[in-house]
Regions:
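Catalytic palm subdomain of template-directed nucleic-acid polymerases
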Residues: 1-8, 24-34, 43-46, 160-162, ...
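C-terminal reverse transcriptase regions that engage the nucleic-acid substrate
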Residues: 9, 14-121, 243
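C-terminal functional segments of enzyme domains
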Residues: 28-33, 226-244
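Two-metal-ion RNase H-like nuclease active-site motif
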Residues: 121-129
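A short acidic Gly-Thr/Ser loop motif
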Residues: 128-132, 197
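Acidic, metal-ligating active-site segments
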Residues: 131-140
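RNase H catalytic domain
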Residues: 141, 175-233, 237
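A short, polar/acidic, helix/strand-boundary loop motif
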Residues: 144-172, 176, 199-202
């Protein structure tokens, strides 16, 4: 109550609940340490039938997009559906659409449980770019050295960005990650370990041969406490092994 008063916020005491262990807020089930999807919404996904037109498909995509923070590689999974809508062709529900639809439903139903961000815990940021789709995951170790997912982020590159040199593409998705999660990453007490599959970026903050636009981008990172580390999907190395 004191904190609310300090922030000059007023509340209706009759509508408040105190000492609860979990609560549904903005269609999320929030507990002391975790964040889940609303089970009622997940049942709606289970019961969702196929679509008769593009409008129905767009509604489903928008619904899933609301929960994309829970879904790893979201943009990659839903890419085929989005392409169908963007082309504005005559709607035809085919085998590919059915496969993507079933895949999306499985990911929604079996989604991860996210943990709340703790600025005192060690933070891991893993970044990957595949087929012009930026996929990122923010994780943290708890007191028992167990790595938990905090949030997922997935985004398609714009057309102009697809023509960038590989170094600039990778640098751009680093900038996007810190921009997207700045309110979390700026508060970390421990240096963030950021993994990316591009060795040339390891010495990014010490590189004296950056172009002008690269220097402008790097300036956006100077307020963050982080260290870039290399990882490769081809080596099939787990983040746990790299950070411990």
């Amino acid at each position: 109550m004191n904190k609310l008063q300090e922030a000059d916020l007023q509340i209706n005491i009759n509508k408040c609940k105190f000492h609860v262990q979990k609560i549904i807020f903005l269609e999320f089930l929030m507990s002391i340490k975790k964040l889940k999807m609303n089970s009622r919404k997940m049942q709606a996904v289970v019961d969702w039938s196929t679509f008769n037109n593009l409008t129905q498909m767009q509604f489903f995509i928008d619904f899933c997009n609301f929960y994309q923070r829970f879904i790893k590689n979201f943009s990659k999974i839903v890419h085929s559906m989005i392409q169908l809508i963007q082309k504005k062709i005559i709607f035809e529900w085919n085998e590919v659409c059915q496969i993507v639809f079933n895949h999306m439903k499985r990911y929604m139903i079996k989604t991860s449980i996210l943990h709340h961000f703790d600025q005192t815990c060690e933070t891991i940021l893993k970044i990957n770019l595949f087929n012009y789709i930026n996929d990122e995951v923010l994780s943290q170790y708890d007191d028992e050295e167990v790595l938990h997912s905090i949030v997922f982020y997935s985004k398609n590159m714009f057309f102009a960005e697809c023509n960038y040199e590989i170094y600039d593409k990778k640098l751009l998705i680093i900038i996007q990650a810190f921009k997207h999660w700045w309110f979390k990453l700026k508060l970390t007490d421990i240096s963030i370990k950021m993994f990316i599959d591009h060795q040339a970026l390891i010495s990014l903050m010490k590189d004296k041969e950056l172009s002008r636009h690269q220097m402008r981008w790097v300036q956006k990172l100077i307020d963050f406490n982080f260290r870039i580390m290399y990882w490769s999907d081809k080596q099939n190395i787990k983040i746990n092994a790299l950070t411990r």
